[in-house]
Structure formats: C-alpha cells, structure tokens
Regions:
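Conserved NTP-donor binding/palm subdomain of two-metal-ion nucleotidyltransferases/polymerases, i.e.
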Residues: 1-98, 104-344
Length: 344
C-alpha cells in the first residue's frame, strides 16, 4: 500500500504530481487525509495549511479511538467497521474514519452510550431509526461540530443494536458479530457492499482490502463465516474488484474457498425475495430534545392515535414514520405528545 496505488485508484497521472493527486482526492470528504499522510511518508514538502489539516485529521482519529475505548469500558459497546479497519493500515498512513460505528449488546447499553455522548459533547443532531416492528432493533446517530466546522466534517457516532442490518429484503438483520478481528473487518466491508451492489468499489474500500492482506486468514474457516453471515456473494465480488488493482495475498485463497458457497446463498435470496414480507425501517422525526431521563434504560413506544407512533427516548422524543413526516402530521404528533406528557 503506497502512493503509487493512490495515483492508480484516483486515476491521476503520476507526472501530474502530488498537488493534482490531493486535488482529485477532495472529491471525497475524508480521502485527502489519507493522501496527505501518504505524501508525508514519502517526504513530500508541504506547507502549514496542509500540515494543519493532517494534524486535525489525526486528532479526530485519536479522539474516535478514545471515545470507543471509553464507551466500551462503561457501556459494553464496541467499534466495528472503519475504526478497526484503520488499525490494519501501515504505521503513519491515516485511514479516514468519517463515522464511528459502535454496536451495543442491547438497547439499554445503546442508550447509556448515547446519554454519555450527549453529556460529554456539544451534540446538535440525534437521529433515530427502528428496524422491524416488535421486537425491533434501534439505530441512533449523534453529531457535533468539528474543531473547524467549516473546513472539517462533523463528528459522527452511529450506535446500533444490529451489527449487520441486512438489506431489508433477502438478507436479514444479524445482530451479533463474533469472529476474529480481520474477519470482522471483511464482514463489515461485505455488508457495506450489500447496500450498494451496483456501484464500483470506492477507492477507500480497495485500500481497506489492501490493508487486510497484511493479516493472515484461514481460507475455509473465513469462507464459512462469510457464508454463515449471508455475505458470501458480496465478499466474492469485493475481492474480485480489488484484485483488479492489487495482489490479494492471503485473501486469494479465501476467494477460492467462497466459490462453493455462492449458489446456496443466491438460492436463499431468491426464495426470500419471493416472499412479500420485508423489514420495515421507521425513521424518527425529532419533536423535541428533553432533559436527560437518567432513570430510563430503554425508549418507550406510544400510539395515542391510529397512524401516530411516538418514540420517547432518554434524550429526545420522536414521531416514527416510514416516510418523511408532513407538517400537519408533525403538529398532530406534538399535540398528542403534550396530552401524554408526564414528568419523567
């Protein structure tokens, strides 16, 4: 993994130089940080502005790592996806972490972590989604401004009780993720591909695969885990696409071991797609932020009227809808909330 690979992935002629590489990388919000860190490793001369941008990105990554460790100790949540993947990159190469993804063992742990974040940080946005009906899974995303909110992305932490949410149709929610860390990282990449199957892999995805080639994998066991989590087709496509840009190393044997798993998974998905039953996602429209309800372990669902579902959480209250709420629906929900309101 080196700057030459970045030139190829971003379709930049090396003769155009590092300034053009950095310019091209700015099509993505976080990729410039990876490019800058790679250029520093190469000894490329850069000015104060570029170094300050890289410093802020490094501070952001370190802060995410501290957040994950601290929340893990006090609530039991743990990081999946981007942050663990960053740990597989070579020293000095800064893998961007746009969103810190955390999976909680249960809803109580999730809300404990959310309360901790709201208490310790200037959180401005809290988004809530419920997956399924009853029982359901909860996903919460909190955001607050970066050190320089105009130049840098906001901090974004996504917490969920479903480690792998599936596609809502043929691939179900898989709430628990239990595997060796490199395999978990491969699962996370395959799950991401499940949600965008028609698109080519982003440069960062190819780089993630390159980082994982530095780890060891037992081919048959890894393929069996990917199949058990219903992600054999996505993993196969992901590795095939990455192979067009770099040697797969130990992942080449994993790709070969996936071949016998593909037909069975495609058959299961065809059978599941034939059924009209799917997973409903209900998104919360914020009605109001509240004083933190420290005595609440979980959220509460209220249905004061047909078609009006309210979600009262330890930090805010929401109207739940499968589609964006209209102003009329929101006003009716606020009226219903006031009627049901009691001291918490």
């Amino acid at each position: 993994m080196n700057t030459a690979l970045l030139y190829r992935l971003l379709d930049v002629d090396p003769a155009a130089g590092p300034a053009e590489l950095l310019h091209r990388s700015r099509a993505g919000r976080h990729l410039p940080h990876l490019v800058l860190s790679s250029l520093v490793r190469d000894g490329v001369r850069m000015g104060g502005a570029a170094r300050a941008e890289l410093r802020r990105a490094g501070d952001r990554a370190a802060r995410y790592a501290r957040l994950a460790a601290g929340l893990g100790c006090c609530t039991g949540v743990r990081a999946i996806g981007s942050l663990p993947l960053a740990g597989h990159y070579p020293d000095g190469l800064l893998r961007p972490v746009g969103t810190l993804d955390l999976v909680a063992p249960d809803e109580a742990a999730l809300w404990q972590a959310v309360v901790r974040l709201v208490t310790d940080h200037p959180v401005e946005h809290i988004e809530v989604t419920l997956l399924g009906d009853r029982p359901h899974h909860t996903a919460v995303t909190v955001q607050w401004p970066a050190e320089d909110p105009l130049a840098d992305p906001w901090y974004r932490v996504r917490l969920t009780t479903a480690a792998l949410p599936g596609d809502g149709r043929a691939v179900p929610v898989r709430p628990y993720l239990v595997a060796e860390e490199p395999v978990e990282c491969l699962l996370a990449l395959a799950e991401s591909h499940l949600r965008r199957p028609a698109l080519p892999p982003a440069p960062i995805t190819v780089l993630d695969v390159a980082a994982l080639t530095r780890s060891s994998f037992e081919p048959s066991d890894t393929a069996a885990v990917l199949a058990a989590y219903r992600l054999a087709p996505e993993a196969a496509v992901l590795l095939d696409q990455a192979a067009a840009h770099l040697p797969l190393g130990p992942l080449a044997a994993v790709r070969a071991a996936l071949a016998p798993e593909l037909a069975a998974e495609h058959r299961r998905r065809s059978e599941a797609t034939a059924s009209p039953r799917g997973l409903t996602a209900r998104h919360g429209t914020l009605l109001r932020r509240t004083v933190i309800r420290h005595t609440w372990d979980t959220a509460r669902l209220l249905s004061p009227a047909p078609g009006t579902d309210l979600l009262l959480t330890p930090v805010a209250d929401y109207l739940l809808t499968p589609t964006p709420a209209t102003p009329t629906t929101r006003t009716a929900a606020l009226d219903a909330l006031r009627r049901w309101d009691t001291p918490c």
